[in-house]
């Protein structure tokens, strides 16, 4: 497998360098039957998009935009398909073999191997139409996720544009502690483990030093490790407040993994920018998030999937049992989030092969299909501070464009068939050619 990934990496580097050296130099005119206006939540029929370089320069009725296109324009006919903006995943973990869910999976491979796996994984996000993602933190001493982010930005490899957290900041023995080994086999202390207020501040500064865009705090225990309790608050409110203070002073944002009620509320009071999961969200917590404008990234489908898989996945039996226990709280918590009009952004927190599952889970949980799509477009762009660049198809924004068969505003399962992907004006996927 590693050999195949290496071969793929070298191919991607060659392609990436070619892309970097030869950006699109002819205007592109995309024609489509249906275009979803994510800002309005409506569909416009018989539309066209004129693209120059990496940017949308005009969008509107096909009969009008086509007249404005220059003579040498390249026409991409997406008639019969639905066009929408490139999608955004706000809770990704890109490093390593994402099908190995064991507690020591990352300890069995080097940082270099984990990063090579990341190159492979990023192609799957693109396959599903995700042209931007936020890595929600890793356990990699080499910060491979930041190397991938920068390599994509430089055009060395192909992948979604990335913003990224550093490594999970956790208490010793908490959900972000990579050491699941026996006491007499313990790992040396890692810089992301912090048991004091000053220790948390130092861990934040360590991540910032090496280029993190976001800081990831483990406010509570979690599911996938065999040690922590998802009900238990781990980092104290004082620790999280200090982390937010240090991060915000450096113009970095903060996300908090928070499953249990106490940890959710402490993280919100501490001033974090987004709550990840929020699985046991109660009325008090939802009202507090609404008042403070804190984002929620609910990651619904991953727990639903974990509750159905067995030990062949690598998950520890303790983690499997926790996933089944926590699932009973999920639906009520999501309903509270909707009732309190919380700002919700799309996040998978799983193997990207399962990306369409999250759309279906949010619709099953109470969002309309259009609202679910907005979590991965306009809402996600707002959370990441990128609304002026991505999230909707408008003049002056990035030409991140995807097309799907069917109409996902009436049947969210249409998101399972992404057939065309463009990022920054470059066509990266077009399976229509295979169908002809």
Predicted regions and their residues:
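Bacterial N-terminal signal peptides
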Residues: 5-17
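Histidine/acidic residue-rich metal-binding segments in metalloenzymes
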Residues: 147, 198-296, 324-344
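Histidine/acidic-residue-rich catalytic or RNA/ligand-binding cores of hydrolases
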Residues: 98-99, 145, 174, 225-227, ...
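Active-site gating loops and adjacent loop-to-helix segments of metal-dependent hydrolytic enzymes
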Residues: 96-114, 172-188, 223-237, 292-328
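Metal-associated gating/positioning segment near the N- to mid-region
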Residues: 81-156, 172, 238, 262, ...
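His/Asp/Glu-enriched, well-ordered alpha-helical/loop segment
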Residues: 249, 253, 317-408
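Histidine-rich, glycine-flanked metal-binding segment
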Residues: 22-26, 35, 40-84, 152
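Divalent metal-dependent hydrolysis catalytic cores, especially in the metallo-beta-lactamase
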Residues: 119-143, 158-168, 212-225, 253, ...
């Amino acid at each position: 497998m590693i050999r195949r990934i290496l071969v793929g990496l070298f191919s991607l580097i060659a392609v990436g360098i070619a892309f970097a050296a030869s950006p699109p130099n002819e205007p592109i005119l995309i024609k489509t039957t249906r275009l979803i206006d994510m800002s309005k939540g409506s569909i416009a029929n018989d539309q066209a998009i004129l693209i120059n370089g990496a940017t949308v320069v005009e969008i509107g009725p096909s009969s009008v935009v086509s007249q404005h296109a220059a003579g040498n324009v390249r026409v991409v006919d997406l008639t019969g398909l639905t066009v929408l903006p490139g999608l955004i995943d706000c809770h990704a973990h890109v490093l390593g073999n994402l099908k190995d869910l064991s507690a020591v999976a990352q300890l069995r491979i080097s940082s270099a191997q984990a990063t090579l796996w990341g190159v492979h994984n990023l192609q799957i996000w693109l396959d599903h139409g995700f042209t931007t993602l936020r890595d929600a933190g890793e356990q990699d001493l080499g910060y491979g996720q930041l190397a991938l982010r920068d390599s994509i930005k430089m055009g060395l490899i192909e992948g979604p544009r990335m913003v990224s957290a550093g490594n999970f900041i956790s208490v010793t023995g908490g959900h972000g502690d990579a050491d699941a080994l026996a006491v007499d086999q313990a790992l040396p202390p890692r810089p992301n483990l912090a048991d004091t207020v000053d220790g948390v501040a130092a861990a934040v500064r360590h991540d910032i030093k090496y280029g993190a865009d976001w800081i990831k705090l483990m406010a509570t225990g979690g599911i996938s490790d065999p040690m922590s309790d998802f009900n238990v608050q781990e980092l104290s409110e004082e620790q999280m407040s200090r982390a937010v203070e240090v991060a915000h002073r450096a113009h970095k944002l903060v996300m908090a993994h928070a499953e249990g009620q106490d940890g959710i509320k402490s993280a919100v009071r501490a001033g974090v920018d987004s709550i990840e999961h929020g699985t046991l969200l109660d009325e008090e917590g939802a009202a507090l998030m609404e008042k403070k404008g804190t984002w929620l990234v609910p990651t619904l489908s991953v727990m639903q999937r974990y509750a159905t898989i067995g030990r062949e996945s690598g998950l520890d039996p303790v983690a499997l049992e926790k996933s089944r226990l926590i699932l009973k709280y999920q639906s009520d918590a999501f309903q509270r989030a909707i009732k309190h009009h919380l700002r919700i952004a799309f996040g998978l927190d799983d193997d990207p092969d399962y990306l369409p599952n999250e759309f279906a889970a949010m619709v099953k949980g109470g969002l309309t299909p259009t609202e679910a799509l907005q979590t991965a477009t306009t809402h996600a762009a707002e959370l990441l501070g990128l609304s002026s660049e991505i999230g909707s198809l408008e003049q002056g924004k990035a030409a991140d464009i995807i097309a799907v068969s069917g109409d996902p505003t009436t049947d969210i399962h249409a998101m399972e068939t992404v057939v065309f992907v463009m990022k920054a004006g470059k066509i990266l996927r077009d399976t229509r050619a295979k169908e002809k």
